Amino acid sequence: MPPNSVDKTNETEYLKDNHVDYEKLIAPQASPIKHKIVVMNVIRFSYLHIAGLYGLYLCFTSAKLATSVFAIVLFFLGNFGITAGAHRLWSHNGYKVKLPLEILLMVFNSIAFQNTIFTWVRDHRLHHKYTDTDADPHNATRGFFFSHIGWLLVRKHPMVKIAGKSLDMSDIYCNPLLRFQKKYAIPFIGTICFIIPTLAPMYFWGESLNNAWHITVLRYIFSLNGTFLVNSAAHLWGYKPYDKSLKATQSGMANAFTFGEGFHNYHHVFPWDYRADELGDRYINLTTRFIDFFAWMGWAYDLKTASTNIIEKRALRTGDGTYKRPNGMN
């Protein structure tokens, strides 16, 4: 067990939640709905993806190697801002941090620019509370495209708005650092995500504006789609060793792009576990290693984990039969 961790042995303590039960939908039977398309969002995301693909071409034709390396470094930092920050820390309170690490995670999160932390946390908490219903912002019962990116191209379902108003976000509102990011979202996040990553290669190693900008967009789009895969692929394809009744699956594809967020069936059963996986360091769960490093430094503490006993009991009770006891576990 990593330093400063806490083993949670009472599953029900974390599963109690008084809320309205929205009807669970099964994909082929999801009620038809006429979505209202947000034209500007369609234009914006279309441009970003086209520009990102052009940036990929430039990586192999005219861009300096340093520009590509710089984009990769920012991709890693931005991803940690999402996975270790917006997700495991602020959405689920899976661990606690001291101010220096919290500032770092807020800045890293701004590099990724997947909306403000406030909005990200709100949508994610709705997703967990009303998973795969119409109160889930990216309801996977409406198919791959909708849960991947389509939900950002249309107006929110009325049930998402209703449920969102009753969601407890007091911990986020009370955080001055997150209020700062929300208040200055456009200038602050825009500068950290796009302006500095574009100007830095031009200033320090003479990269062209065309190359610097389009590779910045490539890094941004690659990060976005990695996160999107957790909403789409990890709710459609894969095995379910912990709870076969959930749409959430164990997705190697999503895991590869998100530093350990693809163990999604486990995560939906034990959302408070800071590892988002039974062992936390299997395969490429870099986010857990990132948190463990800062726990070793003393900047992260009270790391919550589910006990092996609870995990096994739950897998045997509700899993699809694919659960295997990890080697070395007592």
Swiss-Prot record:
Domain notes per entry: The histidine box domains may contain the active site and/or be involved in metal ion binding.
Pfam families in alphabetical order: FA_desaturase
Gene Ontology cellular-component annotations: endoplasmic reticulum membrane
Cofactor or coenzyme needed: Fe(2+)
Catalytic activities: an 11,12-saturated fatty acyl-CoA + 2 Fe(II)-[cytochrome b5] + O2 + 2 H(+) = an (11Z)-Delta(11)-fatty acyl-CoA + 2 Fe(III)-[cytochrome b5] + 2 H2O; (11Z)-hexadecenoyl-CoA + AH2 + O2 = (10E,12Z)-hexadecadienoyl-CoA + A + 2 H2O
Protein localization: Membrane
Protein family: Belongs to the fatty acid desaturase type 1 family.
Listed EC numbers: 1.14.19.15, 1.14.19.5
Position of sequence motif Histidine box-1: 87-92
PANTHER family in alphabetical order: ACYL-COA DESATURASE, DESATURASE 1, ISOFORM A-RELATED
Residue window of motif Histidine box-3: 264-268
Coiled-coil region(s): none
Reported function: Fatty acid desaturase that catalyzes 2 consecutive steps in the biosynthesis of bombykol, a sex pheromone produced by the moth. First acts as an acyl-CoA Delta(11) desaturase (1) by catalyzing the formation of Delta(11) fatty acyl precursors. Then acts as a (11Z)-hexadec-11-enoyl-CoA conjugase (2) by converting a single cis double bond at position 11 of (11Z)-hexadec-11-enoyl-CoA into conjugated 10 trans and 12 cis double bonds.
GO biological process: fatty acid biosynthetic process; pheromone biosynthetic process; unsaturated fatty acid biosynthetic process
Tissue-specific expression: Highly expressed in the pheromone gland.
Statement: the UniProt record of this protein carries the keyword Oxidoreductase: yes
Keywords for the protein's UniProt record, in alphabetical order: Fatty acid biosynthesis, Fatty acid metabolism, Iron, Lipid biosynthesis, Lipid metabolism, Membrane, Metal-binding, Oxidoreductase, Transmembrane, Transmembrane helix
Entry GO MF terms: acyl-CoA 11-(Z)-desaturase activity; iron ion binding; oxidoreductase activity, acting on paired donors, with oxidation of a pair of donors resulting in the reduction of molecular oxygen to two molecules of water; stearoyl-CoA 9-desaturase activity
Enzyme class: oxidoreductase
Membrane topology: Multi-pass membrane protein
Residues that span the membrane, as ranges: 37-57, 65-85, 101-121, 185-205, 216-238
Protein name, per record: (11Z)-hexadec-11-enoyl-CoA conjugase
InterPro entries assigned to the protein according to its UniProt record, in alphabetical order: Acyl-CoA_DS, FA_desaturase_dom, FADS-1_CS
Motif Histidine box-2 location, chain numbering: 124-128
